[in-house]
Amino acid sequence: MKKIALPIIVIVAILAIVFSLKKLMSTSSDNIFYEPFKGTVHGTAPFSQISDSMWLPAIDRGIKLANDEIEAITSQFEEPDFENTIVALDEVGADLDRVLNVFYPLLSANSNDAMMDIAVEASQKLSDYTTAITLNEDLWHRVRSVYNDRESLDLNPEEQMLLQTTYDSFALSGANLEGEDREKYRKLSSELSALTTAFGQNVLKEMNTYEIYLTADDLAGLPESSVTAAAEAAEAKGRKGEYLFTLDQPVYSAFIKYSSRPDLREKMYRLYNGRNTSGEYSNIDNIKRISELRLEIAKLLGSDNYATHSLKRTMAQNPEAVYDLLGRLRDAYRPALNAELAELTEFATKLEGKPVTIKPWDYSYYSNKLKAEKYAFDEEALRPYFPLDKVVDGVFGLATRLYGLTFTPNDSIEVYHPDVKAYDVNDADGRFIGVLYTDFFPRSSKRPGAWMTNFKEQYITEDGVNSRPHVTIVMNFTKPTAEKPSLLTPYEVETFLHEFGHSLHGLLADTKYASLSGTNVYRDFVELPSQFNENYLTEREFLDSFARHYQTGEAIPEELVERLVRSQQYGAAYSCMRQLNFGYLDMAWHTITEPVSDPVDFESKAIETVRIFDDVDGTMISPQFSHIFSGGYAAGYYSYKWAEVLDADAFAFFKEKGIFNREAAYSFRNNILSRGGTENPAELYRRFRGQDPTVDALLKRDGITPTATVAQLNKD
């Protein structure tokens, strides 16, 4: 054979191509999001292998593959049917979900500047991607065709709900729009996505800018745990001998409740409630534009306002039903609030020996002292009985007694931060239920608050395998110190119970389709499992299972439990009216019919009928109201009170049957926790409870004499 001599330039070109291919292959194989996670326990995320350089390539690739899957659906020759269109569409985007289900939980719990920048870029890409799907005319025609034939398809309830949800997601997202309106919707959605992301990032960034250094003379009234933590925080910053306070929720709450320095309480209050109202991280322009964009989108889709548009897929169904509930609660609780404030003013005046006008930064301080005097109750007296490790045992044990679940630490599962722990969750018969991650302590990379989310949702694979969920609960409890473990207040135990209730909703999911699994339910139903769990806080039988003094091992004394129970109704009217402030403000922003020019004046008028204190210059709710401006609760904050009615009614049923009654527990599990969004929640609730919910149990629990009742909450 004759040898062929290749020109050197060709050889170089070939080598360059080979090198490029190898580099491409290496890059692909090095990005762990390009394939299902392999070689890890239960297929959990290999956090140690993740680098920030992986996020955008994986997101881009996921979007491309998802678009290819959409193309495969729309280009097929077969007539549209449930399997080749609705089910196929539900399965689109597995590769994209794999990266997003890790990215967004970490963005909230363990973020950095690079991830925040990536989130901004990704939000635009994802907004464009989702909008392109809902405005895909060929896809919409197929979905609509199947929906129009729904009566002849012989679908089971879960399949019917998947079809209805799919159809609604298109219809409520502009699929019926034509021509210029479609392009306008696309642009509005893209801008809205960018602004909601920016809003959330501003909240986190501004929170991290505050460092308040105090001296020993400034610490009067503060509990030892707060002082010790502040001293250690200052020392870590190289300022030994001083005391560092931030605006992290547990730090702020303790300061405003216990500091006997009204000037410092006022300073902290103004800082905390003045966040994002001005300066580099101001959200004033963001809230104006976000609300305007939502209004424009609603009008484009045929609704008078955003709330009318958004509430179509809820139990409430319309703004009138929301305002009806909020108004009934306002009228029922207002007389009690007036009485509470009058009593508190009288107490403060007596305590100080001079007339006192209660200011918003005074409420927690005097309220805590009155509570201690009236019920001989102080949350700090209970803190030693709630060391975090024992609370974990108690909360997990609650799920064991009710549902037969067990939680076993698994150190073989990778975690994303040293503070995080991972658990195997198994059923009573040993069957694997899922993975639970717990993340308890504040850090600069974590946003404030408490929440539950999924790294992976439950669903049934094409092969019939029940793919189990990976769930995480995230909180911001005070960290342990060198001398003491993390000791929780009753409120923090309640928060733990709340988020754990959400986690059970995810862990116990048993549905065919991921989009209907776990917490993928109507927004005003999603808080039922979490708020139901809170009821156990004051149950002696539950407390006896774990509450032990961290030093002596002594069980929590009966007298303290009785005080805790008696104190639960204390301040109930204030607590409700505070939530109604948020609910009315949310609805005001989302029932506007014209853009808002002055957010300060708008907010003041929105909460006029539920106002507790006079406005404080320089402070607002809206610029930090992440729930409605970046957290998915737009026109939905009322759902906390809606679900509170449900949870009080549900727990009243357990009180009748026994709080650990297995029959009642399994009915709650099988009809509420495991069913996700597979059926109308009103029907699921009736199946569990045997009747519709009423507001009576909530009013009774709070010690409120009803001025009106809600006969039925479900609006079929």
Where are these predicted regions, by residue range?
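Active-site-proximal, well-structured secondary-structure segments within enzyme catalytic domains
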Residues: 158, 162, 194, 201, ...
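N-terminal helix-rich structural modules
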Residues: 26-224, 230, 654, 715-716
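Positively charged n-region of N-terminal signal peptides that target proteins for export
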Residues: 1-4
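Short pre-active-site segment immediately N-terminal to the catalytic Zn-binding motif
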Residues: 478-497
